[in-house]
């Protein structure tokens, strides 16, 4: 029975190009969509750019352009990636559109009428220089647990501590460096903790769709059970802050001037907005298509890092706004390289654009991913050696090899005509039964199982072909009797029929190659459908090369840093280039000593200098002038240890003689990066000790 499916992938954030994780998710969804279409189902496959939020606003501001211009720039890149990897969305949209504004505001009003929106006054850090409230990512400070500097406002990257921004020691704005102040503001909350939401989510997260497929994979269901609460019935869900204060690039909240929807509210609504835009183009009834009581199945492909939003907030929002809830949430893991997290600095980052630019076949990657992806929430590992071996062995050595060998005999000796001597073919009969298992594996997203079964049949075809030894029969074909000719034609025809069946089964994974096989090799006027696997071909065109082997050297090129990064100007530590190299003998000429600041006072008539009286362990005190007045109060330096250039020639100044130089650090551009930092040795160092 034909089904109607509405399929989406997670929306990429429109402040950057696609990365390999996006491509993996789109390939996974595209394979599924193609397999469902081949089964005769109607699929509406849409995507969109996630175009709102503070990061986009701030990046655009930094570049001196509008947020809309920034979003448009990245949107213009999308087709190059999608077309390059044969990913075929029906429609690509944006969340910064009239459809998304209208739908987001409609859903909000519906939730408000249900009593599920509540206004509360909350206290947040506010940047008085920037004039905006700060999200956790824009607040930095000292970790309250391990005292590591420059940690973000919600967690420490050094010790792993999780905390509230207000717990940071000496917090500062990552945008301006200013000390943030606590300020109150009214925010809007979606009451996810409401008993109605909790009861619904307990049912939905454990439920199944019309096909009997669970809404959530087992691993995801287990995670939502943790979030929803234990058997004691204690509620664990917190309410969700769905608002942000101006300035903010987003959708305004109705009847709330200066308030905007948090990007995570309007982003998933973008799925619906994209479908609505698509329906307008195609003349489809959007409301009928997404009627909660209608037959359309709503399916989302997402990564494991955004489960919370999609498995709790999203279905609850839709349910109590009177809209259709998702039928299936398909969650995948991340990509690793040789068992490790990808890292550009370690040379293990994969740029999808570089993959295409160096001439690698997109269908190599589609096949490799399919061979490793399954329906579980597992990371997919890209191993370069395995990639080369699997593509060359499976696709070229097994699959394409069948056609290249068998078609040559048919073209040379039978003018492209295929003929089958007898009605029985044990291999074909076996594969006819196996085909249903392969189709089911694709529908269940068990792509690795489907690929294994397909390649196992390719092995059987090659083994049967080798056992028959058609090249032996072909040697004397000119003088051969009719039975021998018929036998040769039958062997090669059945091998090509098997190749066609394999091509049908691989079509969701290798759409471009399968289309060439259908149209160029077998003369079809349409791409393959599942039923074509059992149809015996009658003619074959002269064989044309279908796929190159992977050159391992390409993998070396793939993992090189992108050209733009390689040619970028070298980083300037502290705002200036490193000085020319010196020898150890040059360094030895500089006598650096520990000194204790015995006294410190301002210099009358100078706006920059402080006069330091130093003990360097010589039995006398030294007098040193230092331009650090803007950074330090004299009394704060008394008793501190510092480092002195002790053998610097005395310098006669307007205010007296300076007998050395105290070491301090600063940025080359003091206006852009203000701050002077006197070097202070660790406790235990004594005046007079040499710094070596």
From Swiss-Prot:
Span of the annotated motif 'HIGH' region: 12-22
Cofactor: Zn(2+)
Binding residue positions for Zn(2+): 143, 146, 156, 159
Residues that bind ATP: 344
EC number: 6.1.1.10
Protein name as catalogued: Methionine--tRNA ligase
Name of the gene: metG
One term of GO molecular function: ATP binding
Keyword Transmembrane helix appears in the UniProt entry: no
Catalytic activity, as annotated: tRNA(Met) + L-methionine + ATP = L-methionyl-tRNA(Met) + AMP + diphosphate
Co-factor note (free text): Binds 1 zinc ion per subunit.
Function: Is required not only for elongation of protein synthesis but also for the initiation of all mRNA translation through initiator tRNA(fMet) aminoacylation.
Gene Ontology cellular-component annotations: cytosol
Motif ('KMSKS' region): 341-345
Domain tRNA-binding residues, every copy: 586-692
InterPro entries named among the record's database cross-references: aa-tRNA-synth_I_CS (IPR001412), Anticodon_Met (IPR041872), Met-tRNA-synth_bsu_C (IPR004495), Met-tRNA_ligase_1 (IPR023458), Met-tRNA_synth (IPR014758), Methionyl/Leucyl_tRNA_Synth (IPR015413), MetRS_core (IPR033911), MetRS_Zn (IPR029038)
Family membership: Belongs to the class-I aminoacyl-tRNA synthetase family. MetG type 1 subfamily.
Localization, UniProt: Cytoplasm
């Amino acid at each position: 029975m034909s089904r109607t499916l509405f399929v989406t992938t997670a929306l990429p954030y429109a402040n950057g190009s696609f990365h390999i994780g996006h491509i993996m998710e789109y390939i996974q969804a595209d394979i599924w969509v193609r397999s469902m279409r081949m089964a005769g189902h109607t699929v509406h496959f849409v995507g969109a750019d996630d175009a709102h939020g503070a990061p986009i606003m701030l990046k655009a501001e930094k570049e001196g352009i509008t947020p809309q211009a920034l979003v448009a720039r990245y949107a213009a890149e999308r087709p190059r990636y999608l077309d390059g990897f044969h990913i075929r969305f029906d429609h690509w949209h944006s969340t910064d559109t009239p459809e998304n504004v209208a739908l987001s505001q409609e859903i909000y009003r519906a939730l408000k009428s249900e009593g599920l929106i509540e206004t509360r006054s909350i206290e947040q850090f506010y940047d008085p220089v920037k004039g905006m409230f700060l999200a956790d990512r824009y607040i930095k400070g000292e970790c309250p647990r391990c005292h590591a500097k420059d940690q973000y406002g919600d967690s420490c990257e050094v010790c792993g501590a999780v905390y509230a921004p207000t717990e940071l020691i000496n917090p500062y704005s990552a945008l301006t460096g200013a000390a943030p102040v606590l300020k109150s503001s009214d925010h809007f909350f979606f009451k996810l903790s409401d008993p109605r939401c909790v009861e619904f989510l307990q049912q939905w997260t454990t439920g199944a769709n019309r096909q009997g497929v669970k809404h959530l994979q087992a691993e995801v269901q287990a995670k939502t059970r943790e979030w929803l609460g234990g058997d004691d019935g204690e509620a664990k869900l917190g309410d969700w802050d769905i608002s942000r204060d101006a300035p903010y690039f987003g959708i305004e909240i109705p009847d709330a001037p200066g308030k905007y929807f948090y990007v995570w509210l309007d982003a998933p609504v973008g799925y619906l907005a994209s479908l609505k835009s698509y329906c307008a183009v195609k003349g489809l009834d959007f409301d009928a298509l997404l009627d909660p009581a209608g037959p359309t199945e709503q399916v989302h492909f997402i990564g494991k890092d955004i489960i919370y939003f999609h498995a709790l907030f999203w279905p609850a929002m839709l349910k109590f706004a009177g809209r259709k809830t998702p039928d299936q949430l398909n969650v995948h893991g991340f990509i690793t390289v040789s068992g490790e997290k990808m890292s550009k600095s370690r040379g293990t980052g994969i740029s999808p654009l570089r993959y295409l630019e160096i001439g690698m076949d997109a269908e190599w990657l589609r096949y490799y991913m399919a061979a490793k992806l399954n329906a579980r929430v597992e990371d997919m590992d890209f191993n370069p050696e395995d990639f080369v071996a699997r593509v060359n062995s499976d696709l070229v050595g097994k699959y394409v090899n069948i056609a290249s060998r068998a078609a040559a005999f048919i073209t040379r000796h039978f003018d492209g005509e295929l003929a089958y001597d007898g009605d029985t073919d044990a291999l074909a009969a076996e594969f006819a039964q196996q085909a249903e298992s392969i189709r089911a594996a694709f529908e269940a997203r068990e792509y690795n199982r489907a690929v294994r079964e397909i390649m196992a049949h390719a092995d059987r075809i090659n083994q049967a072909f080798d056992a028959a030894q058609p090249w032996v029969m072909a040697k004397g074909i000119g003088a051969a009797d009719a039975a021998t000719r018929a036998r040769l034609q039958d062997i090669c025809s059945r091998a090509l029929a098997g190749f066609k069946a394999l091509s049908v089964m691989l079509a969701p994974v290798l759409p471009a190659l399968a289309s060439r096989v259908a149209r160029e090799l077998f003369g079809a006027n349409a791409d393959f459908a599942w039923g074509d696997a059992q149809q015996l071909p009658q003619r074959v065109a002269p064989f044309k090369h279908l796929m190159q082997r992977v050159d391992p050297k390409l993998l070396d090129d793939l993992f090189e840093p992108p050209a733009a990064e390689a040619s970028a100007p070298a980083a300037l530590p502290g705002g200036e280039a490193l000085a020319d190299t010196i020898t150890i003998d040059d360094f030895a000429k500089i006598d650096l000593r520990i000194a204790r600041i015995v006294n410190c006072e301002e210099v009358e008539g100078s706006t920059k200098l402080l006069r330091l009286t130093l003990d360097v362990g010589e039995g006398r005190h030294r007098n040193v002038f230092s331009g650090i007045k803007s950074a330090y109060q004299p009394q704060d330096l008394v008793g501190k240890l510092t480092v002195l250039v002790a053998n610097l020639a005395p310098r006669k100044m307007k205010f007296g003689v300076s007998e050395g130089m105290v070491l301090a650090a600063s940025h080359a551009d003091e206006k852009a990066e203000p701050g002077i930092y006197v070097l202070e040795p660790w406790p235990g160092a004594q005046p007079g000790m040499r710094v070596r």
